Amino acid sequence: MSEMTPREIVSELDQHIIGQADAKRAVAIALRNRWRRMQLQEPLRHEVTPKNILMIGPTGVGKTEIARRLAKLANAPFIKVEATKFTEVGYVGKEVDSIIRDLTDSAMKLVRQQEIAKNRARAEDAAEERILDALLPPAKNQWGEVENHDSHSSTRQAFRKKLREGQLDDKEIEIDVSAGVSMGVEIMAPPGMEEMTNQLQSLFQNLGSDKTKKRKMKIKDALKTLIDDEAAKLINPEELKQKAIDAVEQNGIVFIDEIDKICKKGEYSGADVSREGVQRDLLPLVEGSTVSTKHGMVKTDHILFIASGAFQVARPSDLIPELQGRLPIRVELTALSAADFERILTEPHASLTEQYKALMATEGVNIEFTTEAVKKIAEAAFRVNEKTENIGARRLHTVMERLMDKISFSASDMNGQTVNIDAAYVADALGEVVENEDLSRFIL
């Protein structure tokens, strides 16, 4: 779990997302509150529930990007889902309980990686011994007992030194490795029957889990395989499940995107299985309930839910009142200006201009963007957004692709050249398309 302070979290998000200070502060405080809650004593800790967040703002201003970056910072089970993928229980489609099942699977993977990292040193030592056993099978006497001669030991140490220095990397050996899941059994089941399906699948998987098979491979590949094999042996599956469930219950974060798309439209009186029905099904999850997963029962009382939507057609008040009450923190993200676009092109880590420079450098072409050129690109994107649909920062991708079209096509024939992209180059490449509204609508 992340122990970063809110200031550090915001600083980290600033490296990737321009503006939107309120949204960054809200998610930073929410993430820090997870850590604060874990410092409390048990009777009070159970009573402190997370304050769920609703992010409201036009498309392309950074809502989803904040979620993506937060997932990397959180070091906690995290899942991002689209609200439009779900239907009410009993109808064809995914039900909302699958969010928690997927989150638990994500936690299992995360905890497993942490346990493997923790046991890596022991696994590396064991893997090294298995490689040396394959290279130098221990001598046996006539009764089949292993003899331990000093000469054998010194030879083993010499091989160990060569192995660690990488001198044996390309030598091929034959090793025994776990067969793993040899029976690729995939069972399809109707919605609601996932639990039975998972039990059947684990039964078939366990049938072949203890088998080993011989494989011939290079030592450098064998070492990686054996380290994974040994690390897996050091992990207790039951303990792993319990740790994963605890991680989900105490630190889990669910990001629900496009929540405005499940708002009720007008005075429609029929069954609304993918809109209001989904909202009603989300209520118990957000409020706190127990969900059955293949790893065990998971309580959702302390999972943090962050919902986001553009709310261009619907309004937050169109959500059913019970769900509104369960999303107490509202954050509005502002539309981006031309100055914001200019900063987006240059300031973030791995900005668009840096990406294009790196891509062209692979062909031996050096690209330089002048300050004036960046300003012109930002203005062009902003004007097209104003004239047509406002798709926010995503417009920069279409504008940059149009600008770099000729260079991208001819780069393989321009090895060793330097291309200076200035204001005149930008005006020549984008001028006509930006000025003509019809062309803007269909090309950018």
Curated annotation (Swiss-Prot):
Subcellular location, record wording: Cytoplasm
Keywords: ATP-binding, Chaperone, Cytoplasm, Nucleotide-binding
Positions bound to ATP: I18, G60, V61, G62, K63, T64, E65, D257, E322, R394
Major subcellular location class: cytoplasm
Pfam families referenced in this protein's UniProt entry, alphabetically: AAA, AAA_2
GO biological process, one term: protein unfolding
Residue spans crossing the bilayer: none
One GO molecular-function entry: ATP hydrolysis activity
GO cellular component: HslUV protease complex
Region listing for Disordered, in residue ranges: 143-163
SS bond list: none
UniProt similarity note: Belongs to the ClpX chaperone family. HslU subfamily.
Oligomer and partners: A double ring-shaped homohexamer of HslV is capped on each side by a ring-shaped HslU homohexamer. The assembly of the HslU/HslV complex is dependent on binding of ATP.
Function: ATPase subunit of a proteasome-like degradation complex; this subunit has chaperone activity. The binding of ATP and its subsequent hydrolysis by HslU are essential for unfolding of protein substrates subsequently hydrolyzed by HslV. HslU recognizes the N-terminal part of its protein substrates and unfolds these before they are guided to HslV for hydrolysis.
NCBIfam families according to UniProt: hslU, PRK05201.1
Protein name per its UniProtKB record: ATP-dependent protease ATPase subunit HslU
Protein encoded by which gene: hslU
